[in-house]
A protein has these predicted regions:
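C-terminal and inter-domain tail/linker signature
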Residues: 1-188
């Protein structure tokens, strides 16, 4: 049996385990809220995901490209996720190595892995000029350093996300085979 190189449905397990280990009820709720958010996002469930957020969430994506991205408010965040789900972008795995929780929120640190088809990479502007190996495989796996700050409000709802990428995901691409991804994964 081939070992899976990506398994998105394992992403929220470390958060649930950390919540089970601690006694502070507020921290337990915050950890489970982040886990609920992550699970809904990775499973493409918009309403449960948005229910974890405040009425006016704010997202910051740092070092996604040459331009950082900011999403302000319910409509922008909801639209972002709707577009992500339509394009299969929710199918990623967060491999969490460290979790920090306090009364103000949660911080997760680790890696984020995502599979891209050769055709999707080309639609994203990747060419043989920018990535000479693109035509060598139909499927590619990125594996990028990620820190996410999950601030919360006094009602223990998530205010949004501050997402810091340690590197450009396109610079970490490695070929992957179909038998190295879970059966539930949809290749778009």
């Amino acid at each position: 049996m081939t070992t899976l190189k990506i398994d998105p449905h394992k992403s929220w397990i470390p958060l649930r385990e950390k919540a089970d280990e601690i006694s502070n009820e507020k921290h337990k709720i915050l950890l489970n809220e982040v886990a609920n958010h992550m699970e809904a996002e990775i499973k493409g469930q918009l309403d449960p995901l948005m229910n974890t957020l405040t009425a006016e969430p704010v997202y910051h994506f740092w070092r996604v490209s040459d331009v950082n991205m900011i999403l302000n408010g319910y409509e922008e965040v909801s639209s972002f996720y709707s577009n992500m789900f339509q394009n299969g972008g929710e199918q990623f795995e967060v491999v969490t190595k460290r979790i920090i929780v306090n009364d103000d929120g949660v911080i997760t640190e680790g890696k984020v892995k995502q599979v891209y088809t050769k055709d999707n990479l080309k639609l994203m502007g990747v060419t043989t000029d920018t990535f000479s190996e693109i035509d060598n495989s139909n499927l590619w796996l990125s594996n990028t350093q990620l820190i996410t700050v999950w601030p919360s409000d006094p009602d223990l709802k998530l205010v949004g996300e501050d997402i810091y990428f340690g590197e450009n995901p396109m610079e970490t691409l490695k070929p992957i085979n179909e038998d190295e991804i879970p059966d539930y994964y949809k290749i778009n």
